[in-house]
Amino acid sequence: MAHLDLESLPIIGEQKVASLLKWQPLIDTTENALKEFSAGDVVQPVRQIVPVPGRNAIFAAMPAVGTAMAVKIVTLYHDNAGTALPTHQGVILVLDKDNGSPLALLDGRLITEMRTAAGSAAVARRLAPVSVDVVTIMGNGVQAGAHVDALAEVRKWKELRVWARNETKGRQFADRVGARFFQDAEAAVRDADIVACTTAAKEPILRGAWLKPGAVVTAVGWNTSDGRELDDDAMANTVIVESFDAARDQSGNVRGSNCEIFAEAGEIFSGLKSVPDGATVIYDSVGIAIMDVAAAKLVYDLWLPKQEGRRPDAPRKARK
């Protein structure tokens, strides 16, 4: 009976992922994955979250089958912030959809970082004003930086603003990305065309009363049901999510406000639904597995042709 030699399973580490994964292809891939999901062409359970006893942490499994098939195993350890370890760590196992064979194991930290910001950029590309004067980043961590990079791929702006709960780190981040730091959150948000909320705040940091009509807000920082970044007034706007089921089950912004969800992002991208003219849009993201699966498959497909002595269409060998 043949079986796979798992010792030969390719491992694609973060450095290699970084060399292969570029923003524009990833933004396009993420948009297509969300369209595929909303069209009903993805089999995916709601993310399975397991609290880690005695730790300020969770462990999660995120499988999905769409055009590609993979599963992400991820941990979120909040107390790693400020240490040598990242708060998010994970791996993604890409599988052959035709025969179930493992194809490669990929580092999941950078893919998670980039696909999250790519989702925001895809929404901003579709819904943000064509002419953008002000972009505000709320936060100073990994997602704050990723959002600066991703949003720069889809819009040019005149002013970049930063607000953060930690003033020292916020100022350092603002200096690094060429932004103006604001001590006052309201002042930072007023008149902004795009606002990216990327914090781990459990209580609202953004109030709807501050928002410019027609602004696009991307909220990605707190993705479990026991915390929220946006208040009820903010969530009373036109709310877009990746998945109705995932948002209702795991979004603190949605659950805490009991808001109406207007559409899934994939429905907007495919033209099934249209945002009303002049609407203020809230993209509330919890992250869904098909985004990781699509990003990982993109990396794998870019990596495979570069391997010496292996044809891009060659199957992995089984050992007898």
Residue ranges and their predicted role:
Residues 16-18, 224-320:
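Adenosine-phosphate binding glycine-rich loop
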